Amino acid sequence: MNLTHTQLAEHGYMSGFANEFATEALPGALPVGQNSPQRAPYGLYAEQLSGTAFTAPRAHNRRSWLYRIRPGAVHKPFTLVEQSRFLSRFDEVPPSPNQMRWSPPAMPTTPTDFIDGIVTMAGNGGPDAMTGCGIHLYLANQSMQDRFFYNADGEMLIVPQQGRVRFVTEMGRLDVEPQEIVVIPRGVRFRVELPDGEARGYICENYGALFKLPDLGVIGSNGLANPRDFMTPVAAYEDREGDFELVAKFQGNLWRADIGHSPLDVVAWHGNFAPYKYDLRRFNTIGSISFDHPDPSIFLVLQSPSDTPGVDTIDFVIFGPRWLAMENSFRPPWFHRNIASEFMGLITGVYDAKADGFAPGGASLHNCMSGHGPDADTFAKATSADTSTPHHITDTMAFMFETPGVIRPTPYAARSASLQQDYYTCWQGLKKHFNPNVR
């Protein structure tokens, strides 16, 4: 949505990344000068939602205080849900060094909501060790009805590819369209509505440290994803009673509990642990204006840091519209073998390193040290292109989840009918040009 900040405020958003926000849906619902008064305004309950340890350094501490109609503990006991699609187990299929690519999956033919429509493609690590990630697709054709969800295993970075999605969370509402992303923190309860009837996209489930903006180094004080373009919702609440279901993801399994009211009953909240969205089209792309294609780290939107400086548990990178001005240079992303592992998706358009076969809604996986790069057609065009004039790449948006750990496919991904068995052939047309007598 190309809205001004005034319009975004009118639509119910607050600007900034990890700011200390304060918002109330009823006047005076936030206590003044304290977090947990003896009696909260309007007969509300005070509840703290902690996203980091109590003693985490202040610059990294994430928590919010919620003022709600009923505490989060009010529900019946959870029971295990038997299912085999939304997982955190990545040891059932030996990971392969082969390059892998999947065509876009078809939409479901039976009524399927957001949670039932999630299928796990790959991942590494796990929620018990609080490191690594799960990579999933979602395919849905029905809004969640009388059903709510939260993820205790990690925060969810959601990348819509087809269809608008409305995330109605306990901390407010976010309307998201393709080429925007949304991040739902660990533990935040929500339901998903589908304004367009169908929706498809990607999810990165982050088991590790919270996503943050990367340091800019010599880029300076501005660039890449600017903090003011991240939008957090204002408080909005539901006061509904009925026969509802609360679904939780906990240690790789889904659990369900009966709940007699909507858990989206937060009337006011303050803090810096909250859902947010970001429009990828606002990314300030940095590139070379002399020669050579820089490393893809210049396209970094969000990172989940590890304990090793310079190494992230997850990098979220995008490849959007941009100008290529490098002279006498191979302009597409170069051939590469990487210590890290790369899972890519395409939101819209054509990816500049692949002329065919990588369609919007599809995905690819290039694991540690697996060779990859432009296909034969792209190489042929790029090596004969006129580089004396700039080239404008338009109408495209691809992304990458990059991790230092090997990304291990699930049985679903390894045996999927959408797996392109002939993917390797896109490089077989790369011919020998070597001649020791001609430089």
Swiss-Prot record:
Residue numbers annotated as active site: H293
Quaternary state and interactors: Hexamer; dimer of trimers.
Pathway assigned in UniProt: Amino-acid degradation; L-phenylalanine degradation; acetoacetate and fumarate from L-phenylalanine: step 4/6
Gene: hmgA
UniProt keyword terms in alphabetical order: Dioxygenase, Iron, Metal-binding, Oxidoreductase, Phenylalanine catabolism, Tyrosine catabolism
UniProt: homogentisate binding residues: Y351, H372
CDD domains to which the protein is assigned, alphabetical: cupin_HGO_N
Cofactor: Fe cation
Claim: Iron is one of the keywords in the record: yes
Catalytic activity as recorded in UniProt: homogentisate + O2 = 4-maleylacetoacetate + H(+)
Family indicated by similarity: Belongs to the homogentisate dioxygenase family.
EC top class, as a word: oxidoreductase
Function: Involved in the catabolism of homogentisate (2,5-dihydroxyphenylacetate or 2,5-OH-PhAc), a central intermediate in the degradation of phenylalanine and tyrosine. Catalyzes the oxidative ring cleavage of the aromatic ring of homogentisate to yield maleylacetoacetate.
An annotated GO cellular component: cytoplasm
Record PANTHER family: HOMOGENTISATE 1,2-DIOXYGENASE
Protein name, as recorded: Homogentisate 1,2-dioxygenase
Binding residue positions for Fe cation: H336, E342, H372
Superkingdom per UniProt: Bacteria
EC number: 1.13.11.5
Record GO biological process: L-phenylalanine catabolic process; tyrosine catabolic process
GO molecular function annotation: homogentisate 1,2-dioxygenase activity; iron ion binding
